[in-house]
């Protein structure tokens, strides 16, 4: 059976691994998931990202990041736009997450961007998720 929302599955896997403080997790690869993982790495929410070829679709291995005293860097992840209810934001409506402490992942005509990048480039798009 096919998965109806692979992005929500990826976010749930990250959330679950983070809650039990796993060092790493693996998710089936896709182009959007690779972009999400790269943004999480660039913004400092995860330590590292690896791509593993398995002669099928590939695997993304995500290494989670924890602070001193093993405190979580990712406090929360929330899927916003879902297959049953898409959520779009115009250029001037791109949301801020916790007044800039978190990020919103926005799928735009210029690729997947954070809310800050979307505002800087003055583009809107589909609000995929919030990470804080």
Curated annotation (Swiss-Prot):
The superkingdom of the source organism is Bacteria
Q: Name one molecular function that GO assigns to this entry.
A: rRNA binding
* Cellular compartments per GO CC: ribonucleoprotein complex; ribosome
One short Pfam family name for this protein? Ribosomal_S8
- GO biological process terms on file: translation
Name the InterPro entries for this protein.
Ribosomal_uS8 (IPR000630), Ribosomal_uS8_CS (IPR047863), Ribosomal_uS8_sf (IPR035987)
Q: Which PROSITE patterns match?
A: RIBOSOMAL_S8
Q: Which UniProt keywords apply?
A: Ribonucleoprotein, Ribosomal protein, RNA-binding, rRNA-binding
Show the SUPFAM superfamilies listed in the entry.
Ribosomal protein S8 (SSF56047)
UniProt key word RNA-binding: yes
Q: List the disulfide bonds.
A: none
Which family is it part of? Belongs to the universal ribosomal protein uS8 family.
Relate the protein's function as given in its record: One of the primary rRNA binding proteins, it binds directly to 16S rRNA central domain where it helps coordinate assembly of the platform of the 30S subunit.
Q: Subunit arrangement? A: Part of the 30S ribosomal subunit. Contacts proteins S5 and S12.
User: What NCBIfam families has UniProt attached to this entry?
Assistant: PRK00136.1
Q: What is this protein called?
A: Small ribosomal subunit protein uS8
Organism name: Lysinibacillus sphaericus (strain C3-41)
